[in-house]
Amino acid sequence: MTETAHDRLLIIDFGSQVTQLIARRLRELNVYCEIHPYQNVTMDFVREFAPKAVIFSGGPDSVTREGSPRAPQEIFDYGVPILGICYGQQVMMHQLGGTVQSGHGTAEFGRAYVTPTEERIDMLSGWFLDQTEQVWMSHGDHVSEIAPGFKVYGTSPNAPFAITADLERNFYAVQFHPEVHHTPNGKTLYENFVRLAGFSGDWTMGAYREQMVETIREQVGDKKVICALSGGVDSSVAAALIHEAIGDQLTCVFVDHGLLRKNEAEEVVGMFRDHMNLQVIHADETELFLGELEGQSDPETKRKIIGKLFIDVFQKYADQIEGAEFLAQGTLYPDVIESVSFSGGPSVTIKSHHNVGGLPEKMGLKLVEPLRELFKDEVRALGRELGLPDSFIGRHPFPGPGLAIRCPGEITRDKLDILREADAIYIDQIRKHGLYDEIWQAFVAILPVRTVGVMGDGRTYDYACALRAVTSVDGMTADYYPFSHEFLGETATRIINEVKGINRCTYDITSKPPGTIEWE
């Protein structure tokens, strides 16, 4: 639980796959909220958290099953507004005296349309302007009898109690998911709910910046902090925020493994050292990394070699910094949420950046994680608040192992040099056409095959490359970007004409799933 002076909203997670989207929608409304799994939410916890309102998330279980997830019964007497969503609606009805039934005949999955009843309420302000509202349903059980005190304000063909409310107690319940994209007007419901709950909307990145600067100063005192700087958005914003708080008590270590994009090391070190006046150690260990990777073609082996060497190299340079007691990490809120499974135990894989995984334990350092309350879009907003240039804030994701996983098969210096040049041309083309910000991630992969070509009057036998560009919201699913044929033809021509060593260019149109975004 995080200490904050802002009004707080508690989201009780019953296991929905889209619970994070609820938090995202609320943060967009400048409302501070936290997600906590239902089994951790006791009334002692609620009183300590002191929420101004509560939301019950959806979930995969059935309230008709004995032992299924519940909210603390006393929370209904706590005196704050509550919104129940899908399974959260069923929990509310079940615990307050209504009836929930299982039945395939009334299940709804996918798009549905809700129709209002005659009586309108403030919670539905801005809704039903076109008589019906499109929503996204995902329920097998259904409410067959609402709890005492509730009335119906919206219905759908298979959900006669799609929207219900007890206005006296400020309890609201919907059978659909207002947080998802497929409920186009869903954000309006959240706006109405937080307005009715009395939130001031003071959760801004400016306020967060001031609060976190003070928190870092209190945590660190006069001790020193080390930061593994990658040049990515997360580590860059974390470093800038910590530097604002403690100045030269922060030292950044930029490990150059020889697998970076064209001019990347110089740009990252130059920005932080020369323009932001951070202390940056540029650890150029290209020879070490490429030497260990020589002859290796298995992608998992390459990842493990790079990860282990990174830790060894980082520790070597960190040991030279006297008095360092803290390690800075760019942990984000989704990482914190995903590190605990719905059952309350450790998840199968706790997400950790390969660059810093295992470092705190190995080095005996305490963690400074100034971004652990933020989503990715909030990190970008904080970066702008801190004055970082858009060229860094808006960068596409770049994997820790770098170009190693964009070079299937064995890695050689020659292939890396070819790949850097081709990738630089591709990104230049995307920027020239004004497409960079429309794309989640774009890169070139050099393929482990040579193909025959003709250039001038001569025969060539050079590498083929694949262009990759995807659109995505969170990287979990992705679709290829629909470039025009003109763009692809122009880009392929530039790469083949300007990069010695490539004579064939393809465009990867695989979605995720079944493919992954990266080639390895």
Swiss-Prot record:
Pathway as given in its UniProt record: Purine metabolism; GMP biosynthesis; GMP from XMP (L-Gln route): step 1/1
Top-tier EC class: ligase
Gene Ontology terms, MF aspect: ATP binding; GMP synthase activity
CC annotations in GO: cytosol
Enzyme active site: C86, H177, E179
Domain Glutamine amidotransferase type-1 residues, every copy: 8-202
Pfam families xref list: GATase, GMP_synt_C, tRNA_Me_trans
Matching NCBIfam families: guaA_Cterm, guaA_Nterm, PRK00074.1
PANTHER family, A to Z: GMP SYNTHASE [GLUTAMINE-HYDROLYZING], GMP SYNTHASE-RELATED
Entry protein name: GMP synthase [glutamine-hydrolyzing]
Source species of the chain: Ruegeria sp. (strain TM1040) (Silicibacter sp.)
Annotated gene: guaA
